[in-house]
């Protein structure tokens, strides 16, 4: 019985080794985007497509997370942004190189007309 439970659990949580990445705690780059027109579905689709293409082609980004805010239920939670992005790097130098790489610059050029505000928080891991 335990063997069966273990086999089922392993199957449920297994991930494709080609797509699984290990979170790199050395340097995290967290970006929040506020769109001019957050309800623009065409703009959102263009942003998501361009962002995913950029992250796939980045030479420096180790792991990434793209998110949207859940409806806040507490006063301390800010749900005013349109998208969040968390990207990890193996060093601050890699993050600096990422800022100037072609894939990143192309993403900015393709999508800069969509946002009215961008806020970045960079952090070193402890």
Residue ranges of predicted features:
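Charge-dense polyanion-binding interfaces
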Residues: 110-126
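Surface-exposed loop/turn and secondary-structure junction residues enriched for glycine/proline
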Residues: 84, 101, 117-118
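Bacterial N-terminal signal peptides
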Residues: 1-9
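Short, exposed beta-strand-loop hairpins at the edges of beta-sheets
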Residues: 96-100, 108-111, 115
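Short S/T/G/P-rich N-terminal loop/turn motif that feeds into the first structured element of a domain
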Residues: 10-82, 86, 90-97, 123-126
